[in-house]
Each structure stands twice: as structure tokens, then as C-alpha cells.
């Protein structure tokens, strides 16, 4: 089996994590794909568990792994480090899975530079900026200042959408999930 690396990026609140969770519950998702768990220095949110959503590490631990060339991609986002370790990708490739990387545009650029055509990329867009703000507020996990900062960064993030192989506007969740499933199916058969 040729394993592919699927990069998925989106502004915070566009529905990336929800779509991925739903996709991984489908027959094709659960049998053929695995999400690489990233390292981060941010604090866990309520309900998040170390080594399930992220590997939560200190800044010193992250920087040590970074100095050992242990990441395929990393970035500092909203004052915290995020990165995907080489060891995590090796672990998933050994299982024979297609790998999904839930990363930002900077990490996507780094990953495409390493893996070339083996890396497929999807950018998920919100239907509008107003809807995006509503979603962020509804999550009830960030302060108003954090939401305002995230909204300031959206234009920069969206400006990189044309670097991706596939753009998906997450307006209707069911339709977006169906489109995402089709994209994954088509790209493992090609």
C-alpha cells in the first residue's frame, strides 16, 4: 500500500477538528487513516488528554526535541509551539496507515517540501468571517482577547489557501463531511 500524508489546515473555528473526528468514524476513515498527534506547549483544554489530542510538553522539552532535529514541521502559533515529530510519522507509517496532519500553513509548507507529491493538502474555510467569530465564541474556550487575536490572523491564514490541493467551505457540516470523504477516497485510489 502506498501511504499518503494528508495535510489539513484551517483557521481556528472553521470545523477542521469536528470534520476529522466524523471522518475517522466512517468505515474508510477508521480502517485506512490515522491522525498524527502533534506536540504542543499550550495548556490542555478541558477534556483533552495527553497523547490523545496532543503530546503536551514544556517549552524546554519542545526546544530540546527541536535542537535534535526531531520535527518534520513546527511553528509558533498564538505564543505556543506546535510540531509533528519524525517519530510520530514513523510510528504511523509502520502501521500502514495514511497519515493526517492537522497543521497550519507554515507546517504544510515544511511538510510538502519534504514529502512532495506524497503529501496531499486540504484547506477548510468558514462560510464567512462572521460565522467564524460566532463559532469561536460558541466554543467558550478562549477569552475575548484571544478570539480577537485569532480573528486578526484569519486573513493571513486564508491568504495561503491557494497553496493547497483542495479547498472545502464548511457551510453545511453533512455536505462538507461527504465532500471530505470523497476527496480522501479519490486520492488513495489515484
Swiss-Prot record:
Essential for recycling GMP and indirectly, cGMP. One of its GO terms (cellular component) is cytosol. Its main location: cytoplasm. GO terms for molecular function: ATP binding; guanylate kinase activity. It catalyses: GMP + ATP = GDP + ADP. It comes from the Bacteria. Residues 3-185 form the Guanylate kinase-like domain. It is found in: Cytoplasm. Coiled coil: none annotated. SUPFAM superfamilies: P-loop containing nucleoside triphosphate hydrolases. It comes from Francisella tularensis subsp. holarctica (strain OSU18). Belongs to the guanylate kinase family. Pfam families: Guanylate_kin. InterPro entries: GK/Ca_channel_bsu (IPR008145), Guanylate_kin-like_dom (IPR008144), Guanylate_kinase (IPR017665), P-loop_NTPase (IPR027417). ATP binds at residues 10-17. Its EC number is 2.7.4.8. Keywords: ATP-binding, Cytoplasm, Kinase, Nucleotide-binding, Transferase. This is Guanylate kinase.
